[in-house]
From Swiss-Prot:
Primary localization: mitochondrion
UniProt name for this protein: ATPase expression protein 3
Keywords, sorted A to Z: Membrane, Mitochondrion, Mitochondrion inner membrane, Repeat
PPR repeat segments: 212-246, 386-421
Amino acid sequence: MNKIVHKVAEAFRKNGVPRTKWLNPKTIYGLANQKLLGSVEAPHAQGTGLNTVPQVEHYTKACRTKQRDMVRSYLEATGSTHFARLNTPAYNKSSALEFYAKLKALQRYTEGEEVLFQMSSVEVREIISRLVKLTQEGDQIPDEQRRFPTELFMDVAPVPNFNDDPGILEQYIGILTHSAFYYHNTSKIDPIPHILRDLLHPQNEKTASLRTTTMFNDLIYYFGKKSDYASCREYYSQMKLEKKTPNIETYRLLFLNLLKNMQIPKKQLPYKEMIFYLNDMEKFGVPADAKIWAYCYHLLVESVSKKLLLEKMIQHNAPISPDFIVSILRTLDVDCKAILEFAKEYSIPFTPKLLRLCISKLCKEYKFESAWQLLTSLCRSTDVVTTGSVNILLNAAAEKGRLDLAVLTYNSMKVQLGVTPDLRTHRLIFKAMARNGYHENFQDVYHWAVWSMKRSTSGWFVHDAWSRRCESMIKQKCGSVTPPTTENMEKVAAILHRGVWDNRGLFIRCWGEYKELRHVFRLLGSIPPAYKGKTA
């Protein structure tokens, strides 16, 4: 690892982080090698003009035109003429692609990066100077403590009767923007953008006095997830037009959207937009926190500017978060052991992002045993083990077609890790099935996977490409999918639920290590070639 990364980590260590727990990398490798929805369910919305959820429709060319017209009328209602999409110039795609290709070519070479720095050094220095000016001493700004369910298996609820209470409206908008709704019409147009645009429409007098900065932040977050960055900028402008003061969360989201938008070919660097937002932060008295510094670092397009920013960060005692150090480590070509030793040396606490990075590294090294040992070591005393980190291991097993590893990890994540599977977890089981291939018990395992998903999704079965591939494999071999009997389903479930990792941990060669579970592996069709056709 280069010197500047060590300097950043040393600066972080000087600040001190209480209640930090460390793991010995040698131990990990050694052991391994050996009430929120209450208001949403209101049946009717009164006095809003949105009593029902709009009819969904197929996403056709006519529908795209309708969407553009809706956005145009929305912007015209603000009374402002500075919105770009009110007078959209022709997008010069070839020019953007040419600039993007030249930028990528320059980034490949040291000489090219120096050229990029010379081209943009004035803007880079202005960005850094404004960051330094906006940085306040003392404690870091805490994140907003708002909790929403990530997945909801229900139809989108109608707008509740908020009765001039911004709290109810704010909660409803928060759920729509932060929760993924899975309903019967998932192949049709999502009605949520229509509802959100109507609720915050400039001419909607019933919600005008109830709108808050948090509501606009939620919409910026939502449309940022959908990569609709133009809408994000427009809601930021509307927020200012309606005299709602932006806060630190607003600018975190805007800088994050800038970072995600860099993946799309552009005709210019993002520096002018960065300076614009930093100027607005100064205007509204919003300080720059650790996340703003981190986003600015990643928005810089070459290493000279990044090194300069890190040096100023250390020099002026700017806030440094553990996740920022993790994001730098993610760009380096180092293995998991080096990351663990680095984290221990500089007292970097284990966070969910650091854990996901370590699990990803271990899976790329095909060290599934080490990954499972790391998960079990952390789950007993910390809350950093999440469904997302387990899904990384599950995905690695599914990529290899190891249905045996996937199913035993799926069963064990609930029992040993105390982690609840999500929709992606179940979809990875179907992926492992499809990659594993068809066998005589394939249909039984398929019905078990469907049954397991329904237990976690309120009885809904949400198809994806992998479940449909499994279904087509059954139809190709059997002609149709035969509905399971209750007796057979209970028998299959009883057998498969016995498959869990015990104190021995995960083993890639589980057929030899877990001989008592060979009946489970046979049911899954995960039999080593040397044992196929044998009874042992």
